[in-house]
Amino acid sequence: MAANAINITETIDNSQVRSFQIGVFVLCGLCLIMDGFDVQSWGFVAPALFTEWGITSAAGRVASMTLIGVMIGSLLFSMLADKIGRRPVLIGATLYFSALTLITARVTTLDQLLIIRFIAGLGLGAIMPNAVALVGEYSPKQSRVMAMLVVSNGFTVGAAVAGFIATYLIPRFGWRSVFYFGGTVPLVIGLLMFVALPESLQFLTLKKKSGDLIAKWLKRVEPSIALTPASQFVVNEEKKEGVPIVTLFHEGRATGTLLLWTMQFMNLINLYMLSTWLPTIARGMGLAATAALMVGTMFQTGGAIGSIAIGKPIEKWGFFGVLIACFGGAAVMIALIGQPGLTKSMLFVVVFLAGWGIFAGQAGNNAVAATYYPTTLRSTGVGAALGVGRIGSILGPYVAEYMRPRYSTHQLFLVFAVPALLSAIAVGLLGMVMNRAATAKAAKATTIP
């Protein structure tokens, strides 16, 4: 390495979290909060909208069109981000889904609604993979996992507050007000990002972009670093060539990529299956309407707390043992939900713990995907895994709807536990694959020619 070379990777790894990085985390977190708000608020808007339009049922179709858009957007815009950068894609996607959400407030027919929600979903799909990737790339090594988990939990926070905001707005201003709110806030966030959000320093270095721009943002990360006009910037990886989605399977990554996809698919089919049907099934178990709604709330609350709580254990013990515990524990808790004789208090606790495992596992899935791939494939890798997972999120509610009249409640939740168990197995296998790859890399590095 040249005497005037500055290693970007090591500088960020060894830095402290300063106000500049916190600003990056906050902006990315706000994007994810509004992402979660947009997806979840539809469930609260639908009854008022369909009453006004005189439609009996189409909520599932609208939700599915949004999720299909998210699935496609996760893949397409993630590949684009690995070509042109995280910053332009995040800003563009935020302003894009802001505009489409505002347009949603003006639709007058079901066909218009279906089309607009699909198109809006394309932009929503770009947010999670690029926000998580950028946060990881600006985080010091010792706090990277926690930063990615906290920021990705913004989606869960947004989903949780959607109900409160929609409940306040709809009776006073009508269902359209929810979309006005959901479109205006990301517009402001997008403008703030345009002013303050930096590009990934690793990306800029690998793409051989302006040294002055790299120096400007690197100084914000580590003010004490000595830079001169002759400074050259390097990272601890090489630029990868080829079609990004195909390259995910190169250099020994094929098995790991497929296992990541399996983890995302199984967990998201479970998450959306339970989020959609828990209150309805609880009502069928004999609970009062208020108690049945509380079951769904406990699931989301457990998820919000668990998504942050697993950060320290992962930093101490690593991803794989913690995620196996999350998914394995969730499988047990889900199986217990349908057990006869479960008291209401016990049901709330079991559902809370199931939500903890499922949502915490999802946050962990996103973080481990971001650490698995190199910079030039990071957004594509996270986005592709989420895109495959979104297939599960689309199928989940329909699978539950098909199974519900054919199985007893006890049998139903035993079946619901299977995806969590498969997620735990996939995590264990991925851990073995990554440990074997790390051992081989270390052996190669220490071999003397």
Regions found by a protein language model. Name each.
Residues G54, G85, R106-Q112, P140, ...:
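Helix-breaking motifs and short loop linkers at transmembrane-helix boundaries and internal kinks
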Residues W175-E238, I425-T447:
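Central mid-sequence intracellular linker of multi-pass
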